[in-house]
Design a protein with these regions (language model features):
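Catalytic cores of nucleotide-sugar-dependent glycosyltransferases that transfer UDP/GDP/TDP-activated
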Residues: 2-6, 12, 53-56, 64-578
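Long, intrinsically disordered low-complexity tandem-repeat segments
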Residues: 12-47
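Intrinsically disordered Ser/Thr phosphorylation hotspots
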Residues: 46, 50-53, 59
Length: 578
């Protein structure tokens, strides 16, 4: 087994010696010539022999010294002395190493918000002096352009099942934006076209993945301070750390489990999970893995054994401890309340940036939004077959078409909100009942209703830029990204006050002209109808206040920067050092 070698260099002494020698030689040559020629030659010399070119790139923890050459004719001025003061890099704080383990990561594979988080959060943490490694399965569906750039790092056989059956583990590596991505390779488990198939196949697949990810870290001789696992697919990682791997190097790591959606828990037959995981019998008890007499719950076990449990918003961290939102785990979560923390997600503001978005008819920032959003509205109307009219209010809906997203409420209110001044655009796929209902509305309200029954990233960008408001009336919403993207693009969100929607959208206050959108609390179609009508009233009767809200939304910080700092503080708090 080859050990990974890390080289560290320091250029502090080099920069210092270069500065002294250059200053000395320049002073000596300048004083021998006349004043006029001295100034000319010294200026040329300083530009040509700038010591900045001699400074080597160093790791983020080492200070860089940048020195500007001073031109000395007789006595150096105060300004010249100030130029010789070394500049320091910003203090990025303590350094930690974190291994992210999850079932998907954009741009390699993505089916939902988990893929966005596994992509954007590690990149933001890398900028904060965190050494990050992301581990995901090497699915067959990963685009070939990424597969071709992966490098083989090694392979080994691993005991998996309770009977000690051996399975191949291959490691392929890809690096980008300061983050190392390691892909666990095994054709038996990951040759399907879709990351998720059914629990019969997914349970063995993710038992294997959780154990293989930790075994790969040991094989690579890369011991993280923190192992950060995500959702039920990686929830066995904390259990493996404290059982099968407790006497290995990686067993020293602290474990963090993030719940992106409590509805999905990895519940299946106890004997099946016990066999495939190979975990000891003592973890299969009612306080850990056992869901009922017959089933085991992988997420429940991860909650019990992890050092910290996070959710993707503050409100959701509280909601999941109630019977209404607890999905059968409310009592278990209340028992572990002391280690639950909510941190709101951000979005990748490089990808979602209307000022640089090449998919738009006209890019814009907060200064040009009011004008250029009209151009994008016209382009959206033309492309989707809607009546072209900049004076109409366009309301968008970008969502999976499922019960969770509040679509039964939307179906109830559509007939009431449709008029000659309003258009609705729906983008998404899901339950056939909702797909068919929206197709019916498209036929009924021709020219004013569009049902785009598919998910198309290009169309999504254009809806965010071209619509005036965006509906997110979810039954529950752990965090939600659509409302964050909507605000980034100046589309006013209309949301239900739940989970991350409540944390990120401040209700509009007509008396103070403040707020980011329109909200309603109880899950009732009448309240959604009222919220939409309040939005329409402001849009048509007080456009100045509406435009003010558009600008406020675009100026709102929805990036990962603040959230990444909270995660780093958590990592440092969990791994104190002298």
């Amino acid at each position: 087994m080859r050990k990974k070698t890390v080289q560290t260099s320091s250029t502090k002494s080099n920069a210092k010696s270069n500065t002294k020698s250059n200053a000395k030689s320049n002073t000596k040559s300048n004083t021998k010539s006349n004043a006029r020629n001295s100034v000319k030659s010294s200026v040329k010399s300083s530009a040509k022999n700038s010591p900045q070119k001699a400074v080597k790139t160093v790791a983020p923890t080492v200070e860089n010294v940048s020195v500007k050459q001073a031109v000395i004719v007789q006595k150096p001025s105060v300004e010249q002395n100030e130029q010789n003061i070394p500049t320091r890099q910003p203090d990025l704080g303590p350094r930690r190493s974190v291994a992210f383990i999850g079932s998907e990561c954009y741009p390699f594979v993505k089916t939902g918000g988990l893929g966005d988080v596994m992509s954007a959060l590690p990149k933001s943490l890398a900028k904060l002096n965190i050494d990050v490694k992301v581990i995901i399965p090497r699915y067959k569906c990963i685009p070939q352009k990424f597969q071709e750039k992966m490098e083989y790092r090694g392979s080994f056989d691993m005991n998996l099942c309770s009977d000690g059956k051996q399975y191949y583990v291959g490691i392929m590596e890809y690096q980008e934006d300061g983050v190392v991505y390691d892909f666990i390779d095994n054709d038996e488990f990951f040759s399907w076209g879709n990351p998720y198939t059914n629990l019969i196949d997914d349970i063995p697949k993710f038992c294997y993945f959780a154990k293989a990810a930790l075994a790969a870290l040991n094989y690579l001789n890369w011991t993280p301070d923190v192992v950060h696992c995500h959702d039920w697919q990686a929830a066995l990682v904390p259990l493996y750390l404290r059982t099968c791997f407790q006497d290995t190097d990686v067993g020293r790591a602290i474990s963090v489990l993030t719940i992106h959606n409590l509805k999905f828990q990895g519940i299946y037959d106890r004997k099946k999970i016990q066999y495939w995981s190979g975990l000891p019998d003592y973890v299969f008890n009612k306080d850990c893995m056992i869901q009922n007499w017959l089933d085991a719950n992988m997420l429940k076990g991860g909650i019990a054994y992890s050092n910290k449990v996070t959710t993707v918003s503050n409100t959701y961290a509280w909601e999941i401890q109630t019977e209404e939102y607890g999905e059968g785990l409310a009592e278990h979560l209340r028992y572990h309340n002391n280690k639950i923390l909510g941190i709101v997600n951000g979005i990748d503001t490089d990808i979602w940036n209307p000022a640089t978005d090449k998919l738009l008819a006209a890019d814009y920032d907060e200064k040009s939004a009011i004008k250029n959003k009209k151009i994008n509205k016209k382009a959206l109307q033309e492309s989707l077959g809607l009546d072209v009219d900049e004076h109409k209010m366009v309301i968008g809906l970008i969502s999976r078409l499922t019960n969770q997203k509040g679509l039964d409420l939307v179906n109830d209110v559509i007939p009431g909100i449709m008029d000659e001044h309003t258009q609705v655009v729906v983008l998404g796929t899901g339950d056939s009942q909702y797909e068919n209902t929206f197709r019916y509305y498209e036929n009924k309200y021709k020219g004013n209703f569009c049902a785009y029954i598919a998910y198309n990233e290009n169309v999504a960008h254009n809806i965010y830029a071209g619509c005036d408001a965006l509906l997110v009336p979810s039954r529950f919403e752990p965090c939600g990204l659509t409302q964050l993207i909507a605000m980034r693009y100046g589309a006013v969100p209309i949301v239900r006050e739940t989970g991350g929607l409540k944390d990120t959208v401040q209700p509009y206050n007509m008396f103070e002209n403040t707020g980011n959108g329109f909200t309603f609390d109880r899950y009732e179609s009448g309240l959604l109808y009222d919220a939409i009508n309040r939005a329409k009233t402001l849009y048509f009767e007080n456009r100045k206040s509406w435009d003010d809200m558009v600008i406020r939304d675009m100026n709102k910080d929805v990036s990962w920067e603040k959230s990444a700092k909270q995660y780093k503080d958590m990592y440092v708090g969990l791994t104190p050092r002298d």
